[in-house]
Amino acid sequence: MEALRIYLWSLCLSLCLIIYGANSDPLEDKRALLEFLTIMQPTRSLNWNETSQVCNIWTGVTCNQDGSRIIAVRLPGVGLNGQIPPNTISRLSALRVLSLRSNLISGEFPKDFVELKDLAFLYLQDNNLSGPLPLDFSVWKNLTSVNLSNNGFNGTIPSSLSRLKRIQSLNLANNTLSGDIPDLSVLSSLQHIDLSNNYDLAGPIPDWLRRFPFSSYTGIDIIPPGGNYTLVTPPPPSEQTHQKPSKARFLGLSETVFLLIVIAVSIVVITALAFVLTVCYVRRKLRRGDGVISDNKLQKKGGMSPEKFVSRMEDVNNRLSFFEGCNYSFDLEDLLRASAEVLGKGTFGTTYKAVLEDATSVAVKRLKDVAAGKRDFEQQMEIIGGIKHENVVELKAYYYSKDEKLMVYDYFSRGSVASLLHGNRGENRIPLDWETRMKIAIGAAKGIARIHKENNGKLVHGNIKSSNIFLNSESNGCVSDLGLTAVMSPLAPPISRQAGYRAPEVTDTRKSSQLSDVYSFGVVLLELLTGKSPIHTTAGDEIIHLVRWVHSVVREEWTAEVFDIELLRYTNIEEEMVEMLQIAMSCVVKAADQRPKMSDLVRLIENVGNRRTSIEPEPELKPKSENGASETSTPSEI
């Protein structure tokens, strides 16, 4: 009895500690940042105060998983002014990322930064820092990326940089550094270096530096073999070794007459060219509206220049609008500089994976054919961004200008349900097991049900499909791309994949309803059960509509033929699959008023999952051999 009492007391104490830890702040780190903020006085307002929680609310601050320490501070372009006060930032001993770029910070490199032993990413570019660089960089053994460009640092480049075994990017451009360039050839991980426009750097250009682009060391004094200093400048256009005779003399004209003719012809050509460009521009405006750069100008990988991601910024005050509680702190310029990879092109635009300078990955959706004005667009974004639910992909920020509309989300590395179900059906494919498919179904149902409660129970997703459902770290389904039909131009009659998801009563995408969402969700359930796309073709090029096909197979009482062949290796799931099929079929009935509500579907699917028994894959049987061993039979696919 005494032992039981001690056990219960220990359990209560542990629970109290867990609850306290979940709601506690990294108090010492918090005090350090508040002191820093008080002295630096940023011109841009930050939501930092003593009463708010650091890890969940403070802009530009990221904590570790248990919320006990701050590991990243990102405050680019917030108007920080003056010298970094000692014993503030340096007290964040668990800090890994520090970005204070594009501010008005002055003074020398803070000596007490040596306390930041875990620092991996350091961005202090575009400030007014001066004085020598730290003598011993080896105290930051985890440094991966350093950018100190566009400051006033002087003195020599420390040779201790050669001991940064993990360094991948080093930018010291546009300072007043002097002396020889140290030997950094041992840095095998170094992928980018920029020492350009440090005009007092001297000595021969090392061989290891020549493997980098010429722009990495322009504007540096070098010593050629003759011993005289020469300024490294970009190579000029191809020069001719001898002077050619004047063209005027070939024509028998005086150079004055020839010059007048050239000027007259040039004026005519320029006038004609301007007329042609004006006509083309007007035609393009009539054909495309406001005119956004075409998608084929966007690279699938590589840096996104302003010309390739955002065509232009007409209003310099336009900037990314972040939602409260978002701990990201980057700006449009960061996105423009980020490396980008096209993840997919959907109904409402193209989605990119953008990797920022501190290795943070975000998903950026570039919308097309937005019909709403700025005010209506922003109101809809506020509704979408206000939804906080574990099964809804959270909108972190958005951007609106005349030519560009962007939405920023967290990046889900596991990809979409569509890619997991239909991508890579070859030998190396890792099939989705039944338990994961159930978690996807339950998660997506909860997410959509939460969406339907928003805006006084009137919000509609409008574009539910497997490519808009993602897997989180626990393999639960998370719904993305919600609420966009309200701001988009009406789509043409559906074709291809989109036709397979759209409810029969929907003729105008702007008039989608919650019951049409239910229909689309039912199609996703059928995808999970059959492994087939909503619109697919047979080997004979026959186009198959998934909903119609399932109806016909079930009507002929060949229900077993419906299910994905990859699910047949699991035992004890037949009853669950049949129940899920019945739920899916109730969602895709033609009469909208006969479909269940999403809240009811959550309960029905959870009931199926709660009755789950032990599910184990059956051992695979080898094909029948000559001695009579049996082989498994599988239903033929359409």
Swiss-Prot record:
Keywords, sorted A to Z: ATP-binding, Leucine-rich repeat, Membrane, Nucleotide-binding, Phosphoprotein, Receptor, Repeat, Signal, Transmembrane, Transmembrane helix
Biased composition annotated in UniProt, kind: Polar residues: 627-638
Query: So where does ATP get bound?
Result: L343, G344, K345, G346, T347, F348, G349, T350, T351, K365
**Gene3D superfamilies hit by this protein:** Phosphorylase Kinase, domain 1, Ribonuclease Inhibitor, Transferase(Phosphotransferase) domain 1
Sequence positions bearing Phosphothreonine: T360, T436, T509
User: Where is the chain membrane-spanning?
Assistant: 257-277
Signal peptide (UniProt feature, chain positions) = 1-24
Phosphoserine: which positions carry it? S339, S416, S419, S513
One Gene Ontology cellular component annotation?
membrane
UniProt key word Magnesium: no
Localization terms from the record:
Membrane
Q: Which residues form a coiled coil?
A: none
- What protein name does the entry list? Probable inactive receptor kinase At4g23740
